[in-house]
Amino acid sequence: MALQFTLNQDAPASAAVDCIVVGAFADKTLSPAAQALDSASQGRLTALLARGDVAGKTGSTTLLHDLPGVAAPRVLVVGLGDAGKFGVAPYLKAIGDATRALKTGAVGTALLTLTELTVKARDAAWNIRQAVTVSDHAAYRYTATLGKKKVDETGLTTLAIAGDDARALAVGVATAEGVEFARELGNLPPNYCTPAYLADTAAAFAGKFPGAEAEILDEAQMEALGMGSLLSVARGSANRPRLIVLKWNGGGDARPYVLVGKGITFDTGGVNLKTQGGIEEMKYDMCGGATVIGTFVATVKAELPINLVVVVPAVENAIDGNAYRPSDVITSMSGKTIEVGNTDAEGRLILCDALTYAERFNPEALVDVATLTGACMVALGHQTAGLMSKHDDLANELLAAGEHVFDRAWRLPLWDEYQGLLDSTFADVYNIGGRWGGAITAGCFLSRFTENQRWAHLDIAGVASDEGKRGMATGRPVGLLTQWLLDRAA
């Protein structure tokens, strides 16, 4: 965790912390805690707002020192924007802005009072949970491979949250831990995070908690199961594949929810080699796997009363003389044959075998998560994941969960009219569907291996990582998936 969290019900003026975080709206209205500090300081905040030294506009942060009548040596005033438009997005932005303002510097402990604000259509528990997940996300620092590079160890370490809901805090912390677990895996370079490393890390976590268990299948076991599609992708790499299976037994005899995550630890594109301008970010092609493992972490930490199974096919798509080729015909675990039109459409080839494997758990619902297509990113950008399902009830559950925590998805069609684009003369199905509608035809391909399941597909290509060389893994959509499971456990 980037931060440690506690609950605090002290009066803001007397709280024993390095900094109190309060809010101000653009019309100079103060948040309740800010009003209390204004009263304790005999109108100091009101005076500063009146003369323009403190602003309430969105994105502004002003650090004040030594307010009279206030025990904390610092007060951070965060701009909340237009009071009439204040809602989910401005609330989450304000939390992130506050955390980033205190991330480095002399403030080690702070009291966040923004949780007392009224957020339309949300309750106090939501305020606390989201404050934890957003602030921890903003405070995250990647250090695993920095070597001798100096890391600034100063800055915020402990955040007290105004409120008294211990369960909301615990769920928020569990979700934040899951997000950070996923981000750390996603950010590791591919010479560190190999299929074996990914499997070992997931198994090590599961081994620490009663009710959690892990099974790691090696190449020989996958061969015995007939996973010819997955193993074809793995053929060109010295880093041999693993199938990661994690189980959380929190729901008695109930049928499990099953999450399948694409775990391509590096994607060269294979014989259809990727070009500069994209290949250097292909360590993030395992973020679907990282996300479902992170959701498993959140579920276990929150001790949700459900059964959950996570399946991650962990594979590197590399090139040598044994690598699979365009025009190869391979046989999947389902028995369906697949003509390879492009070796860079490998994610669906490992997922189809993992989805077939997942059927043995008799899922209540089956959801796969994958950085599957650039086409989804072209269609939807970096703001939302793409969602495909033939099951309206499941799709609506996932959409509602994402909307609730602002980790959103947008539904794309999965109509039968697209299926003909996958026809092959030489096999049961072609692994690409042509130039147009690439995200949808990828979903159609997967649908052929989930015909007997209540299934949905999340294409997270646009949301799994930030854009550019300074970007990092985001941990999305751990928030969406964890909320969906929380809703199922309610």
Curated annotation (Swiss-Prot):
What EC number(s) does the entry state? Answer: 3.4.11.1, 3.4.11.10
Record carries keyword Protease: yes
* InterPro entries in the cross-refs: Leucine_aapep/pepB, Macro_dom-like, Peptidase_M17_C, Peptidase_M17_leu_NH2_pept, Peptidase_M17_N
Q: Top-level EC class, please? A: hydrolase
Which co-factors does it depend on?
Mn(2+)
Q: Does the keyword Translocase apply?
A: no
Which CDD domains has this protein been placed in? Peptidase_M17
Per the annotation, how and in what number is the cofactor bound? Binds 2 manganese ions per subunit.
Which of this chain's residues are annotated to bind Mn(2+) 1?
D267, D344, E346
- Any idea which residues are catalytic in this one? K274, R348
Keywords attached to this entry: Aminopeptidase, Cytoplasm, Hydrolase, Manganese, Metal-binding, Protease
Q: Tell me, what is an example of a GO biological process annotation in this record? A: proteolysis
Gene Ontology terms, cellular component aspect? cytoplasm
Localization per Swiss-Prot or TrEMBL: Cytoplasm
Q: Which GO terms describe its molecular function?
A: manganese ion binding; metalloaminopeptidase activity
Q: Where does Mn(2+) 2 bind?
A: K262, D267, D285, E346
Catalysed reactions, as listed in the record = Release of an N-terminal amino acid, Xaa-|-Yaa-, in which Xaa is preferably Leu, but may be other amino acids including Pro although not Arg or Lys, and Yaa may be Pro. Amino acid amides and methyl esters are also readily hydrolyzed, but rates on arylamides are exceedingly low; Release of an N-terminal amino acid, preferentially leucine, but not glutamic or aspartic acids
- Which chain positions lie within coiled-coil regions? none
Chief subcellular location: cytoplasm
What biological function has been recorded for the protein in this entry? Presumably involved in the processing and regular turnover of intracellular proteins. Catalyzes the removal of unsubstituted N-terminal amino acids from various peptides.
Give the family, as the similarity comment puts it.
Belongs to the peptidase M17 family.
Please give the name of this protein.
Answer: Probable cytosol aminopeptidase
Q: Which organism is it from?
A: Xanthomonas oryzae pv. oryzae (strain KACC10331 / KXO85)
